[in-house]
């Protein structure tokens, strides 16, 4: 492979000149002689010059420095060697536990599986979170999005799902921290170690691999770190395993793409996003899929800028998901956590042919009651409860009980709530909401339903209140 030399360096964008007959291909990785820095080719400008993005700090780069073409895209370690380890976008370990002794590597750029290789599943994945299991159930091998603005609980919900699914799940998990806080990555690692999902003594016995590209890193790292995590998940899937793939946060992937696009001088599109937003998102999401060999179940946190679900970034993500869990600031302000909006959240699995008629009817009854309560709230605010018809008063009382029963203490929030976390089976969830909807519990006060697990706990709590 021919060497090139730097001809221009503006921030994270580095132009490199090569002999005209030896120009690198798009996405080829370039290495700097005597340095750890990697550049990734983004554009061919002609005359032997390629425009690259630095995957690391570009401090100290000068014109004339020698750059080596590797001839291949970025490759990262895959397989059991990655378990229990924290790696960066290039697959280098950042957990101070020595090198990753891998037997094989894989390119982070690859095509999505062909249509005839796909294997969609209709099996349900129980999460133990009442509101999710009832109104937006997850599918094994499906894609789930947790949508929410700043501070409504996306990361806490993600941690609880990891706690409930990954710990009980016999398969493997891959966690990609994309442009999130370093503190959260650190907390996650220690939490996994405490739960024995990460085995510090013998990392090969761990069940999770972690890839981090944090907020403070250059845009190139944040743009590619999701692909690094996905490549590791795909390798486990292709070995015939069932993999959980967690991404926190997919919006930062879009944002990094916007930064890179601006640095490369592309004309922005709506709201300043990159013109290639749909294509970049599609290329990532189409690879997160289950094949006849194994499955990838993906759970992605999606930040919603200014709580606007019509923003191009969350709107583009919506199209690729099987289940959407929408977190609402209005519900959080009532003190109801998880702050999932049961009227906005959707799932393709909520179909009587998939979940069964009993589950479907219960979920629709709950949504219908809450929708009617939402319509009556304006009348209550202006005229008061006394002006409502008797049947509407009864409906409002049931809706308020349902709303409170949708709250639940989380295991990961025990530290700051002081209440022990609860895992509620789907059978108990359906039973509880059926009893409220049928009017069996009309005599109990609504406070009894707040922050409990099963309906039996609510009945016990009501006795104590009386």
From Swiss-Prot:
SMART domains registered for this protein in UniProt: AAA
Pfam families linked to this entry: ATP-synt_ab, ATP-synt_ab_N, ATP-synt_VA_C
SUPFAM superfamilies: C-terminal domain of alpha and beta subunits of F1 ATP synthase, N-terminal domain of alpha and beta subunits of F1 ATP synthase, P-loop containing nucleoside triphosphate hydrolases
GO molecular function: ATP binding; ATP hydrolysis activity; proton-transporting ATP synthase activity, rotational mechanism
Transferase in keyword set: no
Keyword Nucleotide-binding: yes
GO cellular component: plasma membrane; proton-transporting ATP synthase complex
Reactions mediated catalytically: ATP + H2O + 4 H(+)(in) = ADP + phosphate + 5 H(+)(out)
Domain of life: Bacteria
Subcellular location as annotated: Cell inner membrane
Swiss-Prot/TrEMBL keywords: ATP synthesis, ATP-binding, Cell inner membrane, Cell membrane, CF(1), Hydrogen ion transport, Ion transport, Membrane, Nucleotide-binding, Translocase, Transport
EC number: 7.1.2.2
InterPro entries hit by this protein: AAA+_ATPase, ATP-synt_VA_C, ATP_synth_F1_bsu, ATPase_a/bsu_AS, ATPase_alpha/beta_chains, ATPase_F1/V1/A1_a/bsu_N, ATPase_F1/V1/A1_a/bsu_N_sf, ATPase_F1/V1/A1_a/bsu_nucl-bd
Predominant location: membrane
Function: Produces ATP from ADP in the presence of a proton gradient across the membrane. The catalytic sites are hosted primarily by the beta subunits.
Family, per entry: Belongs to the ATPase alpha/beta chains family.
Protein name: ATP synthase subunit beta
Species for this entry: Janthinobacterium sp. (strain Marseille) (Minibacterium massiliensis)
Lineage of the species this protein comes from: Bacteria, Pseudomonadati, Pseudomonadota, Betaproteobacteria, Burkholderiales
Name of the gene encoding the protein in the UniProt record: atpD
